[in-house]
Amino acid sequence: MRNIAIIAGAALLSMPIANSVQADALVERGAYLANIMDCGGCHNTGAFTPEPNLKTPLSGSLVGFEIPGMGVFFPPNLTPDKKTGLGEWTEEQIIAAFTKGERPDGRMLAPAMPWMSYSHITPDDAKALTAYLRSLTPVENQVPGPFGPSEKVTGPYLTMKMPE
């Protein structure tokens, strides 16, 4: 009887470790995906500058880009900050943003966001990427905009030339 109690206790104690290892593997997979999907190429405070800021990854860009005829867009904060990032978004809302281009309020993301390239991501990879984004240290960083074509822009930006 004593052996059964010891085995049962050991099994119960190992469950949190197994869950922790699975969660770590999920976040690690998500970090890999964020890297190959080049999320930091835009959603970084040093994006579009000679010196990217790697201390606050994916906390949004302070340099925007203009899409002629559409406006100026600043890549937003993807950290789990509740005020300026994705902290109030559900897993489903985050996944809909990068697979369907939909914001929680129903508006579409800027066309420069390559969500169509990510629309066929597997459900497991979508959850991994979301787990990684949620694992980041929250950074309060309110990026400017977006700005319509006739609005005054309050930050530096690049102009994109669309193919003809």
Model-derived segments and their meaning:
Residues 25, 35-36, 44-73, 104-164:
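Flexible coil segments in periplasmic/lumen-exposed cytochrome c-class electron-transfer proteins
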Residues 83-89, 96-102, 115-118, 130-131:
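A structural feature that tracks compact, well-ordered secondary-structure segments
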Residues 22-32:
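Cleaved targeting-peptide boundary
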Residues 6, 27, 91, 123-126:
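Short functional linear motifs
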Residues 66-96:
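Mid-chain, structured segments of secreted extracytoplasmic proteins
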Residues 13-21:
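C-terminal segment of classical bacterial N-terminal signal peptides
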Residues 1-8:
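Bacterial N-terminal signal peptides that target proteins for export
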Residues 41:
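Short, cysteine/histidine-rich loop/knuckle motifs that typically chelate Zn2+
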